[in-house]
Amino acid sequence: MEPLGRPQEGAIARTELALLAVGALVLSLVASWPLILHLGDSLPDLGFGDPYLFSWQMAWDAHALVTAPLEILDTNTFWPLSGDLVFQDAFHGFSPLALIGEGTAAAVIRYNFVYLFAGTLAFIGAYLLAREIGLGPIGAVAAGIAFAYAPWRIDQHTHIHVISSGGVPLTLFLLLRGYRARRAGLVLAGWVVATWQMSLGFTLGIQFAYLLFAIGIVCIVWWLKAGRPQVAAPLIRATAVGIVLFAGWTIWQALPYLQLQDRLPEARRTTEELGFYSPGLGGFGAASENNLLWGEVTEPVREKLRWPTEQTLFPGVATIVLVALGARFAGLPKRLRSLLVGSLLVTGFLALGFGTSASTAVYEVLYEIAPGWDAIRTPGRLMTLATVASSLLAGAGLQRLWDARGGHSGRSRPLATGALIALTAVLWFEGLGTTPLSTPPPVPEAQQLARPPILHLPTNGIHDRVYTFWSTEGFPEIVNGVGVLDLRHTRELRASVRGFPDGSSVAMLRKLGARTVIVHLDRLEDPDAWLQAATERARDLGLDERIVGRSIVYELDDN
C-alpha cells in the first residue's frame, strides 16, 4: 500500500468535478443564508467592522495598481504617515477582482463574492485532497464538510483572511497528485496556489509555510531512505521554479513588515498580547455563541474565556467521533494515519499558545527563534492546520462506516445508508452559525464636499473602520486609520482631538496639514449638546462651520 494512501486512479470524472463545484457552492450559500439576498447592500459582520476594512483594502490595492503601483504601501488612510498598508494584514490575493467596479457599492458585492468563494474553495480543496489519499466520494464529502464548516470557524467569519484557507488543502492535493503522476504542470500549479494562499496574508501564510517546510523535510528523508531514486527532470524544474516563486513572493511581501518593526517597535507582537489571545484547554470545549447547535450548550465554558472570538476552538462532537474511527481505518496506510494523528495533536497543542504552562514552554521557543512566528497574533488560528488533519481523519471515519455497510443485507442496508447520510448532515449542521448582516451606512454628502486631508469625528476603532470604508469613494486622504497594530500615533491623535473644536486640537490638526474636519452627529452620544457647545467654540476660533445633512463640516484653512 502507498505510504500516503492509494492514489486516485486517473483523473476525477468531469461529472464528479461538476457536482463538487455545484455542491460546494450550494453549501456555502445555505450556510451563509440570507447573504445571497443581500449581496449588494449588506456585509457579514460580527460587530467589529472588519469586513468594512477588508472591502476597502481590496479596492485600494486595485486602485494603487492602476494609478501608482510603486506607491501601493502609501494608502489614503493614516495621513500623513507613509507605508501604512503594512498596518493591516497582507491581503493581496483577491485584489484583481477590484479592477471591476468602483466605490462602496462595488466593494460590498466584491467582498460578499469573496466570502462565498472562501467557503466553496475550502470544501473543494479538502474534498480533492481526501480523494487523492484514497477516500471515496462519501468520505471526501465528510472531509470537505469537516474542514470548511469546522465549528471553530464560525467566530472567524468576520476575518476573511482566516476563512480563506481553501488554498491549503488544494495545494497539498496538487502537489501530491503531481508528484505521484509525474506531472510537472500539476506540481507547478500546486506552488502557484501556495503562493496565492500566502498572498492572502501571514495569518495563515506563516503556518502554511512551516507545514510545507516540514513536509519537504519528510520527503527528503524518505527519498534518502529509499536509496535516492531518480526524479524526473521536469519535476525537478517545476519544483525549483515553484519554490523560487513561493519564497520570492513571501520575501517581497514580508520585507515591508520587517522594516516596520525597525521603524515602529510596537509593531512586534508582545508575549503579553499573545497571552491575552491564547486559549486555555477550555477553548476546545467552547463553541461560538452563534453556533446553532452548540452555542447555548457550551455557554458556561465560553464565559470563562478572556476573548471568546479568538478562543472558541470547539471541534464538534461528530468530528471527534469520526476522527476516532478514522484513526483506525484500515483503508488508509498506518503511516499516513499516524502522520495525520500526530499533525492534529501537534498543531492543536500549538494552538493553545500561551494558554497552558506546557504549551507556553514550546510556543515561547518558537516565538523567539522561528522566523516569522512572532507575527502570529492569535495562536488559536493554528487550528487551520489542525483542521486539515482532523478533516481527513473524519472523512476516513465516515468512509470506514460506509464500507461496513457491506455487512448489512435486506432492509438494513438502506437504513444504514440513511443513517450515514444523516450523520454527514449532523457533521455539517454542527458547523453552522448565524452571522449577522450589517448594512453599511451610506457615504455622507459632507465627504463629497470636503477638501482632503479629512479628519472624521468621533474617532475610535469601530468608527474608523466605517470612515475607511467610505473613503473607497474616490480615496480622499483621511487622517483616520485603523489596523491590526496598536499604534502610539493613533492613540495620541485620538486623545488630542477629543475636545475638538478647541484651540489645542485645531492647532495640532493645522500643523499636521489637515484641511477639513467632519463631525458625524449620528455617531455622537448627545449630538444636540455637543453641537451647542461646539458652535460657540468654533466661533471663538474663527472656524468656518457648515451643516451638511447630519454632519458638521469645519474648514481649518482659508485656501
Please place each PLM-identified region on the residue numbering.
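Extracytoplasmic
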Residues: 262, 266-275, 402, 422-559
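Signature aromatic-anchored transmembrane alpha helix within multi-pass, membrane-resident enzymes
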Residues: 239-247, 392, 397-430
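Start-transfer (signal-anchor) and selected internal transmembrane alpha helices
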Residues: 1-35, 236-244, 328, 332-343, ...
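Membrane-interface coil-to-helix junctions
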Residues: 27-122, 146, 150-165, 275-303, ...
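Membrane-embedded helix bundles of polyisoprenyl
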Residues: 24-28, 115-133, 137-223, 239-252, ...
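Hydrophobic alpha-helical membrane-interfacial segments at the cytosolic entry of transmembrane helices
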Residues: 16-25, 193, 216, 229-255, ...
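Membrane-interface helix-loop-helix junctions at transmembrane boundaries of multi-pass membrane enzymes
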Residues: 12, 224-239, 323-362, 405-413
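Membrane-helix boundary/interfacial segments in multi-pass membrane proteins
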Residues: 44-47, 155-162, 300-311, 346-389, ...
